[in-house]
Amino acid sequence: MGKAKVSNAIIRRLPRYRRYLGYLQTKGIKKISSNELSEMIGYTASQIRQDLNTFGEFGQQGYGYEVDKLYREINKILGLDREYKTVVVGVGNLGQAITNYTYYYKIGFNIIGLFDVNPRIIGNVINDVEVLDCADLEDYVGREGIDIGIICVNRENAQQVADSLVAGGVRGIWNFAPIDLVVPEDVALESVHLSDSLHALSFMIKSKEEEGRDLHTAK
């Protein structure tokens, strides 16, 4: 009998738990209760306990959670106790920013390959990694055993890049192109549409302005 599928909502909450636990570690805090975590994070204590119990028993009733232990366990759950060979395809402003962001390397996402189609960029060295021609992407991915491809190209070329990554044997794709990619079921896909978040922020600003006008009118 296989493992029960973990809901997407729980998966989205786990990195937030990890982030707060990491903060507690920097403050030297050794244990914390679900109620205290609830006050910090904003989820209910029962929600936190339920999420964590999905993966096992990490706390003790009346004692709470050991911060260091829970942080390590969440790392294991998220697969952050290993390293991933990673390539970035599209080395414009976003691709360069991702390549130069040291945090990704600290948590095991080692960017060892960079690819672009621009002759003026090919051959450049960014963070000690040479930019290669996208024509060589599929062969490189297969030869080097790349785990993850990060797509930072325009929407017109994103699916072709994804196809090359899949053909080379990647296990996951982090997509920043403004398009919904099609990949096989056995390839993990996480798409980040940055403009969607900005649109949501715009809506929230507009809503608060309307609420303010309504309150002013009601007086």
Language-model regions: role of each:
Residues 91:
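Glycine-rich Rossmann-fold phosphate-binding loop(s) that bind the pyrophosphate
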Residues 1-30:
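Extreme N-terminal segment that seeds HTH/winged-HTH DNA-binding domains in transcriptional regulators
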Residues 31, 35, 40-85:
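HTH-adjacent hinge/linker in prokaryotic transcriptional regulators
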